[in-house]
């Protein structure tokens, strides 16, 4: 890991004013986008990040490093060209091909291509649409080896409330008021256009990752007996099957990465955690919407298992060595070189904040997981208490690497 040391003890409240001040002091171009009645995001040209949403100009709902609290610390982080600057980002996968020089020495050979992250981004704006474009020069370390040029364009724009057209009793909130009015909302869509040029049959896919604050529970909308693959240390009892999908505790203290087989998932992942004073019984919910295509050749693989692939969604949990965050990850449409047609994917990011029971009802609409289950998780129930443990019946037998006792090198996912 490079750059300033991150204190993993707990999250630091970093509000809208602090984020914009740090970016401005570092000379980083950014744009503020209104994504709800009282919610905004900040699109940064450094690393092509989306920070927020920020409700009522308060703290960011996704994870940001402590360096955002101080101009000097943030300047040092940027000067180091480190990738770990928080927020929502797009990388190009498979990681095993473009970031791992030697899959037999995964952590020892991890290397982030600097043209990918932080990269050089051109930032533009038309109305409420912000565009970021960059060219990444990549080297493939798996067969076929060689150089790959990736042209990546992102368009970030507001997303309408996903529940706005619901009718009937199920759409009602407290006292019969519409559920859409019972919770705060901030949402945006990231359109990702990916084109590659290479001299061989190189695989590539856009890869959307949001760094979220740990301490909550992820819900993957999925079929029963979902195929789940361990990439690092086994997830174990932090995962359980629940009605409507799979629940996973993201602690920020237990390193693991898991993948979900494309035929078994809808493409939606939710993440709920408590916010504020426990006595107020409030929660925040993040739902990522993407397209999971069972016919697509999703090419990410665990390092010890060549040929084990086909996962369209991933979850990552840090052990504290990189800041104690977690990541919600979704894959875009795979392309195959040498010169395929460019593809465009759309990733939705819907955020809701309010009373726990209301937020849980929103989750039921979007994920198919019962509201009572989501509310229990938001109030601190572990996955094993929400449903039967899925560690033995759901996870594959894919081997996991030996735990690494040393501080992690840069690269998490």
Where do the protein language model's features map onto the residues?
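Long, low-complexity, intrinsically disordered segments
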Residues: 396-413
């Amino acid at each position: 890991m490079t750059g300033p040391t991150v204190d993993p003890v707990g999250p630091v409240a970093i509000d809208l004013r602090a984020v914009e001040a740090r970016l401005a002091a570092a000379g980083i171009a950014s744009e503020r986008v209104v994504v709800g009645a009282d919610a905004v995001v900040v699109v940064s040209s450094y690393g092509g990040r989306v920070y927020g949403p920020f409700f009522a100009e308060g703290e960011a709902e996704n994870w940001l490093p402590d360096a955002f609290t101080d101009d000097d610390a943030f300047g040092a982080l940027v000067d180091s060209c480190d990738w770990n600057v928080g927020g929502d980002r797009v990388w190009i996968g498979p990681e095993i091909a473009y970031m791992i020089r030697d899959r037999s020495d995964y952590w020892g050979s991890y290397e982030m291509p600097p043209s990918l992250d932080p990269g050089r981004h051109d930032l533009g704006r038309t109305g409420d649409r912000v565009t970021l474009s960059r060219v990444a020069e990549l080297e493939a370390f798996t067969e076929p080896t060689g150089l790959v040029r990736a042209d990546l364009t992102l368009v970030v724009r507001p997303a309408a409330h996903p529940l706005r057209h619901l009718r009937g009793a199920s759409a009602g909130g407290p006292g019969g008021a519409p559920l859409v009015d019972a919770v705060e909302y901030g949402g945006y869509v990231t359109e990702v256009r990916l084109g590659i040029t290479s001299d061989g049959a190189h695989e590539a896919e856009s890869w959307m990752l949001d760094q979220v604050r740990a301490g909550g529970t992820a819900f993957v909308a999925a079929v029963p007996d979902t195929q789940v693959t361990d990439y690092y240390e086994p997830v174990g009892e932090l995962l359980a099957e629940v009605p409507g999908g799979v629940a996973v505790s993201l602690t920020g203290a237990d390193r693991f990465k898991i993948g979900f087989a494309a035929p078994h998932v809808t493409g939606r992942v939710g993440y709920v955690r408590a916010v504020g004073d426990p006595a107020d019984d409030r929660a925040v919910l993040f739902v990522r919407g993407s397209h999971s295509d069972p016919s697509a050749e999703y090419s990410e693989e665990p390092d010890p298992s060549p040929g084990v692939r086909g996962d369209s969604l991933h979850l990552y949990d840090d052990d504290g060595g990189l800041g104690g965050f977690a990541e919600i990850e979704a894959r875009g449409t795979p392309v195959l070189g040498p010169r395929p047609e460019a593809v465009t994917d759309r990733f939705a990011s819907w955020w809701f904040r309010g009373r726990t029971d209301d937020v849980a009802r929103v989750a039921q609409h979007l994920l198919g997981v019962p509201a009572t289950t989501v509310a229990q998780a938001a109030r601190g129930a572990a996955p094993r208490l929400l449903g039967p443990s899925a560690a033995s019946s759901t996870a594959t037998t894919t081997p996991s690497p030996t735990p690494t006792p040393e501080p992690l090198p840069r690269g998490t996912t």
